[in-house]
Amino acid sequence: MEKRALIAVILSIVFFYGYSALFPPPKKEAPAPSAQQAVTGSQPGAPQASVAAVPAPSPVPAAAVKAQQKEIAVETPDYTAVFSTQGGSLTRLVLKKYRETADLTGKHVTLVDERDPSAYTLSTRAAGIGLDPSALFVSSADSLTVEAGEEKKELAFTWISPAGVTVRKIYTFQGGNYGIDMVYQTANSGTARVGAAFQTVMTYPAVPRVKESRLETFGPVTFAQDKLTEEKVKDLVGQGKSYSAPLWSGFADKYFLSAVVGQGGSIATAAVRSTPRGMLEDTITAPETSLNPGESKSVAYRLYFGPKDLDILKAQGNSLERAIDLGWFAMLAKPLLHSLKFFYKYVHNYGIAIIIITVILKIIFYPLTHSSYKSMKQMQKLQPKMQEVREKYKNDRDAMNKAIMELYQTHKVNPVGGCLPMLVQIPVFFALYKALMFSIELRHAPFMLWIQDLAGKDPYYVTPIIMGITMVIQQKMTPSQMDPMQQKMMMALPVVFTFMFLNFPSGLVLYWLVNNVLTIIQQSYINKSIAAAEAK
């Protein structure tokens, strides 16, 4: 890469990350909306009675609840989920197609694993009818197996309050799909009108169980008002965050997402907080509703526990693919991700797919590279005359600038011609950076030889060092327009970049290395072309 391009990249990186750090987008705590009806149900001609306060069941000791609860395992081709009759909640979810390490004998990724009943996820609250997370439900099955492509299967949990209110919590599973449908069906068999606002409580450890890299992202995520908000765990200590009418809310790390997705406005608010037990809690509250005697209503959600794969998330709908934050250059990063998958179908190696994409990008940008290099050559030839002008008008800056501009016009040289074409490529670089840095496709994907995880760093630092050497070669080949001091500063760049890339994903380093090698080949060809043209 030319020196000007390197300067542009560094300045862009500083601006890109510095601006985000210094001027983060304001996060307003949204007020809770007025209760609205987002439920469906029968409307019998029952008289409108006043809402009755339903007494809460007598508290049951935690040890007794744990002894009475029963676990139900659900097996699908993609995951194993274990539910508890306590709250009809989820106690464990293991992804069958993903492991914690690149080693095939490593443990499968576990998104939910709670042995403490007070920390079960997807537990349910509804104060108006006396339902709390410790309530014991009755399950419709002792176990469930869903095969790939098989018809949907249901697992229902039923609870009846002392006042005669029946709550059915129904989960629907489908083979080959990470999405789970969840519906609350409520029927009032009592004699008084009751009101309730169901709360689904998701819990997550405040510290990630597995941190795959120093660049790991982790914490609550909420999509509301067409905007993704990612909260930092440290910002939730001592205070929570509330969101009005979000489309979905949950927890995410670099590669996986756990979320509750609203259906037909079924989420009134989502409130996230850090608990004294060292857990994160996301309380999803449905719009408040009331039921007359003999009336029934339902409220629906869509659950997702799975990988942050662009295609899989998009197939789920509800803008769930926005959980993959590709930054300012998402419009470029998404096509690059699709291209990566496209070439993988044919070569079955993501490392080779990265090389193919790099070659294609080099071909696309060749006219710009040629124009940039040619302009730099012309500027290099003008250096002696420009130096004469500077000496002649060293005491008159206005006259010197005028003379230099006349020199440019006479020789038809654009002073920024060597830089602007390269600046056009900067957005593509950042888009590819985002695509490769956060692509689950590269996670544990082998390339060849010692590189067995393209999402992890090069274990022996071979590729970053070779990359640094190629940068030195590029600098030697690039026409110089700098004074000795500037040249010394530029010579330090390969060292800086080498150390910076030591802990970068090897897939990203591979791209940069191949790009450098192709640039060296390009420069050699352009040098010969220009020399041949001048010899004629």
Curated annotation (Swiss-Prot):
GO terms for biological process: protein insertion into membrane; protein transport. The keyword Transport applies. Residues 30-54 are annotated as: Disordered. It is a multi-pass membrane protein. It comes from the Bacteria. One of its GO terms (molecular function) is membrane insertase activity. Disulfide bonds: none annotated. GO terms for cellular component: plasma membrane. The chain crosses the membrane at residues 5-25, 350-370, 420-440, 454-474, 494-514. Keywords: Cell inner membrane, Cell membrane, Chaperone, Membrane, Protein transport, Transmembrane, Transmembrane helix, Transport. It is found in: Cell inner membrane. Pfam families: 60KD_IMP (PF02096), YidC_periplas (PF14849). Residues 31-54 have a biased composition (Low complexity). Belongs to the OXA1/ALB3/YidC family. Type 1 subfamily. Required for the insertion and/or proper folding and/or complex formation of integral membrane proteins into the membrane. Involved in integration of membrane proteins that insert both dependently and independently of the Sec translocase complex, as well as at least some lipoproteins. Aids folding of multispanning membrane proteins. Interacts with the Sec translocase complex via SecD. Specifically interacts with transmembrane segments of nascent integral membrane proteins during membrane integration. This is Membrane protein insertase YidC. It comes from Geobacter metallireducens (strain ATCC 53774 / DSM 7210 / GS-15).
